[in-house]
UniProtKB/Swiss-Prot annotation:
This is Cycloviolacin-O10. InterPro entries: Cyclotide, Cyclotide_bracelet_CS, Cyclotide_sf. This is a cyclic peptide. There is a cross-link at G1-N30 (Cyclopeptide (Gly-Asn)). One of its GO terms (biological process) is defense response. Probably participates in a plant defense mechanism. The lineage of its organism: Eukaryota, Viridiplantae, Streptophyta, Embryophyta, Tracheophyta. Expressed in petals and roots but not in leaves, petioles and runners (at protein level). The keyword Disulfide bond applies. Keywords: Disulfide bond, Knottin, Plant defense.
Amino acid sequence: GIPCGESCVYIPCLTSAVGCSCKSKVCYRN
């Protein structure tokens, strides 16, 4: 539920390496 400061509209979350996932076009972590 914490925004990772990255969008995932056109590309996947690069922050997925630290546990972030794409939700509603924005990368979130928990």
